[in-house]
Amino acid sequence: MLIPQPPLGKRRQQRLHSTAMRQVGQRARAATPGVVVGVISDTHGLLRPEAVAALAGVDVIVHAGDIGSAAVLEALRRIAPIIAVRGNNDRESWAASLPEIVKTDVGGIRLCVVHDIKRLGGDPASEGIDVVISGHSHRPSVERRARLLLLNPGSAGPRRFTLPVAVARLHVGPAGLRAEIVELGAPRPPAR
């Protein structure tokens, strides 16, 4: 569990978010064969050491909301640049600058990140989106709909019911996209 830290000022939050977005954009443009995106959601203020270990070595981290505290984002930022959206439980002042939806390019693919997929309007595929990343349900899933990949890493925070505690990795490379759910406490996935 993270030790609570004082909330960041609004300007500092905005500066950190835009710096991470610039770093992500630079990495995407300069991407060599293979980019690994770490995907996490629903931490609810708890960043498990197993989640940190599962995300080690990724090129960028996506947090799909219900972060719980600015300290979670700060700890993840020490691993890799972050793309984050606000979840329905992210109501404190530290989360005010986080968007509800982010559409961005990473490693030559177009991502759309939203906490609750039900809040995503329209047809993502018609907008050129390759992958929709969401959270909220706490149920890890990888689903293909034609050329669109839907990825929910599940919850990496406090266990809910009998659902697994998990994160995901999205591998982007010349051979296409590959998503994997990483249950925490299970053996670490092989290196790319």
Place the predicted regions along the sequence by residue.
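General structural signal for secondary-structure boundaries
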Residues: 69, 171, 185-186
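N-terminal active-site segment of His-dependent metallophosphoesterases
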Residues: 2-82, 90-100, 108, 163-166, ...
